[in-house]
Amino acid sequence: MFGKNAKVDLELNRDVEQLIKTGGKEKLLPIVQAGEPVLRQRTVAYNGQLSKRTLAKLIDTMHTTMLEAPGVGLAATQIGLGLALAVVEDHVRDDEDDPREIAEFPFHVIINPSYKPTSDKTASFYEGCLSFDGYQAVRKRWLDITAEWDDEDGKHHSEPLHGWPARIFQHETDHLSGELYIDRAEIRSLTTNENLEDYWCEDPVPTEAAEELGFAL
């Protein structure tokens, strides 16, 4: 459980309830875009500031918003809320032939997440962000990490993640520190989603894009 002395922040709880209501019956919240100050602010650690009921509603609304976008992760900052929590989920078939090492990543609520690399191996692939809508860029990330987080019940988790699930976890955790993926991306690789589909999707390894657009892998 979260801290024994944790108390619900009544003002914050009311604000979050109002935020949830803006999603309507569809439970769809607007996703804030790059340039909004909240995306650049370090979040406050979650320690029970919301009632269990409000937290459950927030998680449900974030999950619905993420899936509808569609995306595989959504941080609280992306809906304008400066708390250290995010939701992640990617239902894909494991593909041993895909160099991105894509694998099933079941739904998780990750609260106060952190990660550490467990090897010096990195991988560079295109990735995108719901708060930098319409574009993707090549970002180098750790291939293997130890991921740590609390779930919605306050239980602590520590698990190894590899490949694409590790990339998703790093992306969402970085959001909660005020970082966007584009901050450390290969800027010359930046492309619209349409151009990515037209030019660079045939091979997930962006070797040709690096040669044509002039960036290093």
Curated annotation (Swiss-Prot):
The organism's place on the tree of life at top rank: Bacteria
Organism encoding this protein: Bifidobacterium longum (strain NCC 2705)
Catalytic activity: N-terminal N-formyl-L-methionyl-[peptide] + H2O = N-terminal L-methionyl-[peptide] + formate
Protein name per the record: Peptide deformylase 1
Annotated cofactor note: Binds 1 Fe(2+) ion.
GO biological process: co-translational protein modification; translation
Residues that, per the record, bind Fe cation: C129, H171, H175
The keyword tRNA processing is assigned to this record: no
Encoding gene, per UniProt annotation: def1
Family: Belongs to the polypeptide deformylase family.
Summary of the function given for this chain in its UniProt record: Removes the formyl group from the N-terminal Met of newly synthesized proteins. Requires at least a dipeptide for an efficient rate of reaction. N-terminal L-methionine is a prerequisite for activity but the enzyme has broad specificity at other positions.
Necessary cofactors: Fe(2+)
A UniProt-annotated Pfam family: Pep_deformylase
Enzyme active site: E172
Leading EC class: hydrolase
GO molecular-function terms, A-Z: metal ion binding; peptide deformylase activity
Alphabetic keyword roster: Hydrolase, Iron, Metal-binding, Protein biosynthesis
EC number: 3.5.1.88
